[in-house]
Amino acid sequence: MSFHVNNKAVGDPLNSEDWRIKGYNPLTPPNLLQSEIPQTAKSRDTVFKAREEVIAIFQNKDAQKRLLVVIGPCSIHDPLAALEYCDRLMKLKEKYQDDLLIVMRSYLEKPRTTIGWKGLINDPDIDNSFKINKGLRISRQLFADLTEKGMPLASEMLDTISPQFLADMFSVGVIGARTTESQLHRELASGLSFPVGFKNGTDGTLDVAIDAIDSAKYPHHFLSVTKPGVVAIVGTIGNHDCFIILRGGRKGTNYDAKSIKEAREKLESEGMNPRLMIDCSHGNSEKNHMNQPKVVHAVAEQIEAGETAVIGVMIESNLKAGTQKVPKEGKAGLEYGMSITDACIDWKTTETVLAELAGAVAKRRTLLGQNGTY
């Protein structure tokens, strides 16, 4: 990677700072990119409507008592495949609109345990060229196109700068298991304009996520940038639309009835809204994408039996099943419609699990309506 400003001190430990920094490139200001790729009225309506619907579900005010379903690729590396996936998902979104609020999982940045491809923003050409300005431009155009089609989006929040370029396109945010304990990410969540889910820690415990929700509802101050790109101190008012996502962990899965009951009671004891999502992948699938339908089935059984604590699920899905490594020839050699990060279920399986979830929600609504619970 070439740099606009090369650091002459690189490799010289006698310098007191920056000797491990190779150089610097200017970053496109957020407001410039947003003016080049503006949000249309249709996109804005898509985003705002879904934000309101997600909050209504979280607060148990949704008239249809629907289930929030965040579903889509583990990460997006091919905008064309993402658009095709969206077109297919839109048909199911409309088909199950009375029972499911479908939001497309649209992750552009990937936290890595060690090293690896960090996402479409960081390395859009998947060749270690790290053309981040290009990645931001591609990502914003993709999100503008997806929301213009009427598809609301959910994405993971990894830093305090990229949301300034893209957050106007999001209806749901997620803080991952690795970053839920991070003070900076809790501060970030406190200022986001949409609901945010915090995943339980990688060890499977809930305490860090509960602490995160509690922290995010208060005002904070942290470092970020303004829309013109000037480094600034950001002051927030707090975000009361945060919730827990059960994703399993090193100690095992936590999508079973006992785990959900314990999580609900824990939230109630802390004076919090006892409503949560289930991540059907990651620890709950034991990192095997073929287990996701099993998790969905177990959750669907609880929903149709009347469980109301579960407000949503997260599913990793793509056009084709599995995952692939980037070949020597780079992105040109990739198989279309298949993940290059976590393995996903295929489209046929996606149709099956969404149908099962919609049926479970309908049964729950009938059951609790008869009991006068709703």
UniProtKB/Swiss-Prot annotation:
Pathway: Mycotoxin biosynthesis. It catalyses: D-erythrose 4-phosphate + phosphoenolpyruvate + H2O = 7-phospho-2-dehydro-3-deoxy-D-arabino-heptonate + phosphate. GO terms for molecular function: 3-deoxy-7-phosphoheptulonate synthase activity. The keyword Nucleus does not apply. Pfam families: DAHP_synth_1. Keywords: Amino-acid biosynthesis, Aromatic amino acid biosynthesis, Transferase, Virulence. The keyword DNA-binding does not apply. InterPro entries: Aldolase_TIM (IPR013785), DAHP1/KDSA (IPR006218), DAHP_synth_1 (IPR006219). Its EC number is 2.5.1.54. GO terms for cellular component: cytoplasm. Induction: Expression is up-regulated more than 10 fold in toxin producing cultures. Belongs to the class-I DAHP synthase family. Nonribosomal peptide synthetase; part of the gene clusters that mediate the biosynthesis of AM-toxins, host-selective toxins (HSTs) causing Alternaria blotch on apple, a worldwide distributed disease. AM-toxins are cyclic depsipeptides containing the 3 residues 2-hydroxy-isovaleric acid (2-HIV), dehydroalanine, L-alanine which are common for all 3 AM-toxins I to III. The fourth precursor is L-alpha-amino-methoxyphenyl-valeric acid (L-Amv) for AM-toxin I, L-alpha-amino-phenyl-valeric acid (L-Apv) for AM-toxin II, and L-alpha-amino-hydroxyphenyl-valeric acid (L-Ahv) for AM-toxin III. This is Phospho-2-dehydro-3-deoxyheptonate aldolase AMT16.
